[in-house]
């Protein structure tokens, strides 16, 4: 057996393609996020009301915004969205931005107080503050990238303001102590806070992705189980129980009917699997979750749609359909889901995949349920719509292909001809005593 070249070539070719494909997809999508970063959405809030200094009204917040916009023209990695604080909170609460830089209302007043000819006593002067907000619910890596960009912009603004304050101090008659000059060189205090906190048992904002991945895997495994069980019941496959092999009598049936049976069975086990996934994660593991009824419905629907889609691929392509389902639902889906590395930090190929790959839509809907109060515009409505489209596409594709196979007589197990069935069913007449076979044939 091992001396047959076909065995080695066939197995080796499939293994080579699968290993190469998984390596290119998994590593290729995540190997250089900073180099691929483009248009990462970050909110920029200027709540500064300005202050009077030297006989004129100044607004340091507007100067910071102008400086950030000027820098952004040559650097397309960050998409700064200028909004109000209320709008920023809404965007953070829907996962539309990965973070924010907030300029407070009294920013100009505290800056001008530092440059006053009669500054407050040392240690009593309030330092101007810029606040960087993170958003782990939108993705920990994306939130980290947003925080780094916002802090970089805040420290650059602090250095620019410090230069102006030092110039003002140098123009005064009384020189400032060295410690005071050092404080003026970097006057702004940059603080980091959580813009949309998630629970302590939310895997740092990754629980939605892991939950969605479990649902997809359950759908695929369920489809494989259903496919093998239906084929076993029809007598197409045997079942091994240790050394014992069992095989049912062959039941000839159409491909369309076989697919319909499998899909109906998949719907039934989706109820069980979806329920047990929620029980395991929420009840046993105490994962942070709300809207438990909606979570259950979403889980069952996801497993059912993924399972039905996999069964359609199995029915259309046979054994290669199992490998194809793995590529569609896992190999291409995980790196393009945007759950770990944000879509804005992926190569263009993976951004295109994210437009239709199921795991991306499933994860967004799961985030909306777990983190964003099940808001429809936080990704939940898109997830339901995508799930409905995928279900219709799977049904149409699966039944169209199997019906075509049936009409062309491409049965999974060739059926015996009608004449041979009749001969098999009609017993032969016994030969008369003393009559040879040749004589019997001649008599007939």
Predicted regions span which residues?
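Membrane-spanning alpha-helical segments of multipass transporters and channels
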Residues: 262-268, 276-279, 283-437, 442-443
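Extracytoplasmic/periplasmic domains immediately adjacent to an N-terminal transmembrane anchor
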Residues: 1-201, 205, 408-444
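N-terminal membrane-entry
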Residues: 199-219
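Alpha-helical membrane-anchoring segments
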Residues: 6, 10, 209-212, 384
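Juxtamembrane interface at the cytosolic side of transmembrane helices
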Residues: 218-271
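Hydrophobic core segments of alpha-helical transmembrane domains
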Residues: 215-223, 394-398
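Helix-boundary and loop/linker segments of multi-pass membrane transporters
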Residues: 1, 248-252, 288
